[in-house]
Each structure stands twice: as structure tokens, then as C-alpha cells.
Amino acid sequence: MLPLLLFVGSIVAPASVAAADSRPNILFCIMDDASYMHMSAYGCEWTDTPSFDRLANEGILFQNAYTPNAKCAPSRSSILTGRNSWQLEEAANHIVNFPAKFRTFPEVLRANGYQTGKTGKGWGPGLPGEIDGKPRVLIAKNYGSENLDKKPTTGMSNEDYAGNFEVFLEEIDSEEPWFFWYGSKEPHRRYEYGSGQKLGGKSIDDIKEVPGFWPDSEVIRNDMLDYGLEIEHADSHLGIMIESLEERGLLENTLIVMTSDNGMPFPRGKAQEYEYSNHMPLAMMWPKGIRNPGRTVTDMVSFVDFAPTFLDVAGIRFEDSGMQPSPGQSLMDVFRSRKIGQVNPKRDYVVIGKERHDYSRPGNQGYPIRGIVGNDYLYLYNYKIDLWPAGNPELGYLDVDGSPTKTEILELFRSGKDRSYWELSFGKRKAHEEFFDLANDPECLNNLADDERLTEVKHKMKARLDATLAEQKDPRFLGNGDVFDKYGFSQGHAWNFYENYMAGKESKKRTGWVDDSDYEPEPLD
């Protein structure tokens, strides 16, 4: 482990709210772009995450937690509202104006006596809207006064997340409950190349196997280690926060949650809908509230479950909260159970999907997908396979962040040496349906949609997905999905960016999250 990483509108409170001195504090920790399998608690051998592991060892390690949408803003929208992307109007998309009609759970906690604060990344990118002429506070007042003496690497933030949490604890009334959002900006790109070996003390040989959808090279192994170092940085700040809670005697009645918003910022990860995209790390610790700590739970958990859970532990009835209805379920039954493995047999699937992420397609189009995960299978339906799933090549595949891994795959493709990795990460889908056996193919490389032996299983999952989307009135499923492409962006230049760029009216300077070399010189279709 890198040593502390070098430094480190109101509503009426319902009658059911518990007495203030018994309501737990909540510390919600969310990384930026980390996949499920890269916490050491899950067996990763090239990252060390002792703080996450402590939550797992003294609380619950969730094996099957999923974000409904593997991109920053829409994923965080689901967390805040308890609703799936297709239930959130503009907030289904990335870089948007947050709809006024959707109350967030921190707003509800605040209205019911909770003191709230945040540090680091909250909801975004996008604009929260206004209340009484002032920016709406979707999460909480930001605590950002404390900074590290030196950035650990050129790619990391210099924010002292743990220091800002300490400032929050010093300011609040210790007799009243609180909610704090710790939004690490790591492991979001960009990384300092080679930092994983140089500062993290790791070797590229520590990585036993590179995912099959990337070439195995020294460059890519270094890219993975650099990503792992940033995960460790996020974890180290959580460790300091836990120590502070212990010193203050607050740990016993604090629910601590650690997860990530979406998968790793690599090709075929973040912004897609595969295991490396949507399957999230999740551990929770609450000494006073979780029975039989040290359990591993296999229930299917969705990010839409967070809001109902947090209101439940705070003694607030969801139906009295003023929030829009949620398909999520409180996890209090899991906390109160002593069971290992599957706790609630009804919690056996989650639904996922995506609409528009970044702005690299004609007509402001997204790449719509809906899917369902359960019983070790993943079913996906790609609505528009004539579109480029990672964004148009002539605009740099904007849905995939620039990186050494992306560059290497593009170079292999352009040189004619190997196009297979490009097809997996950037090529157009060959069929509307994708179906994967996750137990035997967690990398989602072998599409079994046409395997007759699994036809019945696939049809059952598709039927369950369709029934869920119909019940939730998904515009895409009901035939009005183009509404998602008509919603505006919170950044004016993004509207019709494709057309404006192709006409020479916009430049690559607007797309700093990719490399200039990611752009193909001409359209590929």
C-alpha cells in the first residue's frame, strides 16, 4: 500500500423519524471509475485496499452490486434519486441540467434534521438548477479548504479529502446525526504513466492476467497499475476517516459505505454495459446496525437501493419523503439478517441501460441499451446497432477516455496488425442481442445469444426485462426513446457538436478527455 498515499426546499419531518440520538450517521464514499474486481477484498493481487477490506471484514461485502448506467452523471443521478436512468428524463444522460422534479435523498435527510457535507466530486458533470435564485444543493455544502502539500502524482487531485472530513466533524453539532459524501476524484483519468510501479511499489508481473479484450503488453500493464495506485489513494483517505471516527467515539453508530460510480476508464469498461462497466465494488460497515459482521452477501443490489436504504436507516418513510417513487429496496433486511450468501430470494436480478453519454454522434444521439443481470447471466439489447457504441471514429470515440490502452488498440487497428481488440471496444455491434454466461465468461467475450441450448434462459430474462421496463414506463421500451436525444446539454457547445466539428466550427479542444490522436482522419462507414 502507498503510505497514506504520500499524505494524505424543506418538507415536514414525518412522525416516524427516530429520536436524534439514535439515528446513525452515514459516511458515503464513492470512487470515480473503479471496477468491482479491483479491490483486494475481491482477490485482486495488484491493489491493496485495507480500508475497503476493513468494511468488508467488519461489515458486509456485496458480491453483486451494479450501477444502472456506467457513466458518472447518470450513475450518480440514480444514487441520489433511487430511480433508474430511463425514469429520470434529462438525468438519464451525461452533461445535463438536473430536473427540478426529482428530490434527492440528501435533501430529504437535511430536511429531517441531518447535518450534511461533502468533499471531492459530487454529482456531475452538469448543472443542478436553482432554488430561489441560488444553485440547488443536490448533495450538501462542499468542504474543500484542505489540500495536500503536494499532489501525490501529476494525475491526482491535491484535495485532502480526509482533512475536509475533519473540518466537517469539527463544525457540526456532535449531538445530531450527519450525512457526509466523500467523492474521491480517483481513479478518474488522467494518470501519471509509470506511477504504479514508481510510487506504488508494484511490478507489472503482479498482474497475473490482462483482460482478454486488450492486448497484453508492458504499456497496458503499466496503465493498469497506474489505475490501481489511484484506487489505493482513494482507499487511504477512507482509512484516515475511519480512524477519526474511532477517536471521536462515532464509529459504532456510523454506517460507512464504499463503492464507485462506474467501471474503469478503459476501452470496454466505463460507458459500456458489460461486467467491467456496471459491476461495482460495494462494502458496508455499521457496528451497531449490521448483524453477524464479516459476511459476504450475493443478493443482486442496484444503486437505486441506496436512497431507500439511507432513508430507512434514518427512520424516514420513503413515501413521506417527497421523492419520486423508487423501484429500489432498502437493504435493512440484509443488515438485520445473519445469513451469508443470498439473504432475500426476491432480490435476484438488476436492470441496467444507457442513453446518451458524450457528444460524438450525429443528431445528438446516444447509444441506447437495456439489459438485465441475474443468475450468472447478462442479457443486453442494443437498440441501434447502426450507430457506433463508443462514439463516431472521426470524433475520437468520445465515450472512451483517452489512455495508453486506447492508443495501443487504435495503433494495432490502424497498422493492420490486429483489429480484433478494436472490434471489441470500438466496432459496431453485430446483433441487437448479447447474452453472456458470467460464471464462465466474466469478460463478456463469447456472445451466446444464438446458442439454442440457452434459448429458454435468454427468453425468460428478456421477458423479465421487458416487464420491468414496461412497469417503469421506460420511453425507449415504449417506442418514444428518441426523447432522450432531444434533451439539451448543460454545456451549450455540446449541442450539435458532431455537425459543428465536421463543418469546422468546433475543435478538438472541446474534447480534452480524449487524445487528439484518437480522432480518425475520416469516417469509417
Regions found by a protein language model. Name each.
Residues 467, 471, 475-480:
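C-terminal structured "cap/appendage" subdomains that terminate the fold
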Residues 1-2:
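Universal eukaryotic N-terminal targeting presequences
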Residues 5-10, 16-428, 433, 442-463, ...:
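Formylglycine-dependent sulfatase
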Residues 477-491:
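Short, charged, surface-exposed hinge/linker loops at domain edges
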Residues 438-440:
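Extracellular, beta-strand-rich glycan-interacting domains
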